[in-house]
UniProtKB/Swiss-Prot annotation:
Residue positions of the active site: N420 (proton acceptor), C422 (cysteine radical intermediate), E424 (proton acceptor)
Site (Interacts with thioredoxin/glutaredoxin): C774, C777
Annotated protein name in UniProt: Ribonucleoside-diphosphate reductase large subunit
Native species: African swine fever virus (isolate Tick/Malawi/Lil 20-1/1983) (ASFV)
PANTHER family in UniProt: RIBONUCLEOSIDE-DIPHOSPHATE REDUCTASE LARGE CHAIN, RIBONUCLEOSIDE-DIPHOSPHATE REDUCTASE LARGE SUBUNIT
One Pfam family hit: Ribonuc_red_lgC
Key word Disulfide bond present: yes
Modulation of this protein's activity: Under complex allosteric control mediated by deoxynucleoside triphosphates and ATP binding. The type of nucleotide bound at the specificity site determines substrate preference. It seems probable that ATP makes the enzyme reduce CDP and UDP, dGTP favors ADP reduction and dTTP favors GDP reduction.
């Protein structure tokens, strides 16, 4: 009861409803323990009004401010004086030299804009601590630290860009990736998020990749490994006269490495392993995530890894024919030592014409004719085995190998054999002479920051995309590389990955529903603007600093933009420019796209520009919904490394308050329904339709939205699906639809659970299965 009266006073003072309350005096009368209790108490009241969560966040910020330095330079000075300081001397020197500018520009009041989940995430993961675990900086200090790392650590201190980047970060217009946030300004600034490794079939390289992955993970990077080149189990090893163990024991070894090499001590290590479907060990691979009992006791499972399938068009064609009884689904299995290079070729075209450029199909059937196969199965049997596992653990992911390669600006560099931890990064990588290990630096733009009453500010989005492009390009030069092969790859291709978050917030603010023609058009236009802004700035940077070394021969060097590759493949109609011009109200016209093509021929700074990653941490910090996803629920608890937090859909609450419907009765019905409003008939049908959760909407809607935005994505996207029941037919429907529409990602996670209306839990847990595992490429 005491908490209730204190909270009532605090709420009145905070929101200006009781001017006779001295907020500072009231807070100073409370000790640390009492304030922590109030934070928990306020958080529990979120179901009544999201302002309680806001109040809890402000109390948490107040508590942090009481124990940290009151100026940026002082915070840096205190950290530098620590015996085990992580800060680099160069960074400290820059801060001391320009401390008057930094101290006067930083705005600590912006810390109070963070959500409760945001401030707790910052405290747990991003803010620098001393050796005893005591937090030494505030969120604004972290934003300034990142800005200085990006624009102040080179030969020239670009003060204008430092302050602009700080401003964009602190106002939550943009966010940078987790490794950038917690490693910026330190002695070993590994700022990159995603790493791609290709494992060769020799003992030395097999163990080298264990070491490399562990080193990368220790610096905060997430890892994707291609295993398609490893010979199958029982294959003969001529050098020793023995038989191969295949991929299973190696996967177990990488699983152990991941568990040991956590990400900078801040969160668990995170690896994903990829395999092509023709590999003899494919069934073993598909079973490993779910092995239990005796197999688990013998340590033949690897439950901590993520798994991904690299799926060629040929398999999808055979699968579709088998589904529709047009063929028997025969699928041949090979060991790469007997049938080499299948993972190194792809089909440039999807045409069935005999003269079509289909190198994978040609080589596959050549090996069949030569009887090099070691097993025979059917496409259905493989997909059924995949489904058994995906129902239990949500993955293996599905990446469409040929679509990824034929739509890559870097297809001339080499075949893309795998993706990263969250299947949105697609960089060629290989071992051997002049080895390259793929690297990508990530950031994301807050789409909700550009809502202007009932319209959208595409010009602002274009400008922000340009600023992020320059930031990420600098990170390539200023970051630490764990291996020479990672440095070589990043310097040669200079790939960046700009993502988004808050798309659902945009639709809610504009009172649109997912799947409507208007929403799909805006989705397309937003990602067109994002790509345009990034490409425009990359071209400008090329004029200033030079193109990336692998630019000659790239699609851009021939005047082909990312959507042009989709048009060439027949997956996008040529009139897309007119459609985007109409949606953006003339901001992006066909003429501007042609000017961009002509300029690109002269040079582009970055081989890749956009990639749509999960953004749980950014969403947590800013109170916006994750990446391009619909709302998972209108009320749920979010479990993170920072604890559990109640999340209430503020847009729904505002809409219901607007029509005087937000009441205790509605709150209770929302609780009873597990966050769904579909059966609360007092709520108008139009609002119920707009606030369908990700599971309640037809999953084809998610595929159609993905198809609208994918042509403007340089790499790929972390595309989730949500189903009530584990029915293979439903999953196949969206996978085949996505493949036919030319998507690069078939699926990231597939979530299955009973519908909200059938659950009687008070609050349903958020289904972010990847949250604790995949945060390396989360923002």
């Amino acid at each position: 009861m005491e908490n209730f009266f204190i909270v009532k006073k605090l709420a009145s003072a905070t929101y200006g409803k009781a001017l006779n309350v001295d907020l500072n005096k009231l807070l100073q009368a409370l000790n640390h323990h009492s304030l922590q209790g109030l934070i928990s108490y306020c958080s529990a009241l979120t179901i009544l009004h999201y302002d309680y969560s806001t109040l809890a966040a402000r109390l948490s910020v107040y508590l942090l401010h009481q124990s940290t330095a009151s100026s940026f330079s002082k915070a840096v000075s205190l950290q530098a004086a620590q015996s085990c300081s992580r800060l680099s001397s160069h960074f400290v020197d820059v801060v001391y030299k320009y401390k008057a500018i930094f101290d006067s520009y930083i705005d600590y009041s912006r810390d109070y804009k963070l959500s409760l989940l945001g401030i707790e995430t910052m405290k747990n993961s991003y803010l620098l601590k001393n050796k005893d675990g005591v937090i030494m900086e505030r969120p604004q200090d972290a934003y300034m630290r990142v800005a200085i790392m990006i624009h102040g650590m080179g030969r020239v201190v670009n003060m204008k860009m430092i302050l602009l980047t700080y401003d964009l970060l602190s106002r939550h217009v943009i966010t940078h990736a987790s490794p950038t946030m917690f490693n910026a300004g330190t002695k070993k600034p590994q700022l990159s998020s995603c790493f791609l490794l290709n494992v060769n079939d020799n003992l030395e390289n097999l163990y080298d990749m264990v070491k490399t992955a562990g080193i990368i993970s220790g610096g905060g990077g997430g890892i994707g490994l291609c295993l398609s080149g490893i010979r199958a189990k029982n294959s003969f090893i001529s050098g020793s006269g023995l038989r191969s163990n295949g991929i299973q024991n190696y996967i177990v070894l990488q699983n152990a490495s991941q568990c040991y090499a956590n990400q900078g001590g801040l969160r668990p290590g995170a690896y994903a392993v990829y395999l092509e479907l023709w590999h003899q060990d494919i069934f073993t691979f598909l079973q490993m995530p779910r092995l239990k009992g005796q197999m688990a006791e013998q340590r033949l499972n690897a439950p901590n890894l993520k798994y991904g399938l690299w799926v060629p068009d040929l398999f999808m064609e055979i699968l579709e024919d088998q589904i529709h009884n047009r063929g028997d689904g025969t699928w041949y299995l090979f060991s790469p030592d007997q049938a080499p290079n299948l993972h190194k070729v792809f089909d440039l075209e999807r045409s069935q014409h005999e003269n079509a450029h289909r190198e994978f199909k040609k080589l596959y059937y050549q090996y069949v004719a030569e009887k090099r196969y070691t097993g025979v199965t059917t496409a259905k049997e493989i997909i059924k085995e995949w489904f058994k596992t995906v129902v239990q653990v949500g993955n293996p992911y599905i990446g469409f190998k040929d679509a990824i390669n034929r739509k890559s600006n870097l297809s001339h560099v080499g075949t893309i054999t795998n993706s990263n931890l969250c299947i949105e990064i697609t960089i060629p990588c290989w071992e051997g002479n002049e080895a390259e290990q793929g690297v990508c630096n990530l950031a994301a733009v807050n789409l909700a920051a550009f809502i202007r009453e009932s319209s959208y500010d595409y010009r602002g989005l274009i400008e922000a995309a340009g600023n992020v492009t320059e930031n990420l390009d600098n990170i390539i030069d200023n970051g630490y590389y764990p291996t020479e092969a990672t440095r070589r790859s990043n310097m040669r291709h200079r790939p960046i990955g700009i993502g988004v978050f808050g798309l659902a917030d945009v639709f809610a603010s504009l009172k649109m529903k997912f799947g409507s023609p208007e929403a799909i058009a805006i989705d397309e236009a937003i990602h067109a603007a994002l790509y345009y802004g990034a490409m425009r700035r990359s071209i400008e940077l090329a004029k200033e600093k030079g193109s990336h070394p692998s630019f000659p021969g790239s699609a851009a060097s021939k005047g082909l933009l990312q959507p042009d590759l989709w048009v060439r493949c027949g997956d996008l109609i040529p009139s897309w420019e007119n459609r985007v011009a109409q949606t953006t109200q003339g901001v992006l016209t066909p003429k501007k796209w042609w000017q961009l093509r002509l300029a690109a021929i002269q040079g582009v700074r970055n081989g890749y520009l956009t990639a749509l990653m999960p953004t749980a941490t950014s969403s947590n910090s800013t109170g916006k919904n994750e990446c391009f996803e619909p709302f998972t629920s209108n009320l749920y608890t979010r479990r993170t490394l920072s604890g559990e937090f109640i999340i209430l859909n503020k847009y729904l609450m505002d809409d219901l308050e607007e029509i005087n419907l937000w009441s205790e009765d509605i709150q209770q019905q929302l609780l009873n329904a597990g966050g769904s409003i579909q059966h609360i008939l007092d709520i108008p049908a139009e609002i119920r339709e707009r606030y369908k959760t990700s599971r309640e909407m037809n999953q084809k809607i998610l595929t159609k939205h993905a198809a609208a935005r994918n042509p403007f994505v340089s790499q790929s996207m972390s595309l989730n699906y949500y189903f009530y029941e584990p029915e293979l037919s439903q999953v196949l429907t969206v996978l085949v639809l996505g493949w036919k529409k030319g998507l690069t990602t078939g699926s990231y996670y597939c979530h299955f659970s009973p519908g909200a209306g059938t659950q009687k839990k008070i609050i349903r847990n958020s289904e972010k299965a990847c949250n604790a595992d995949c945060e390396a490429c989360l923002l």
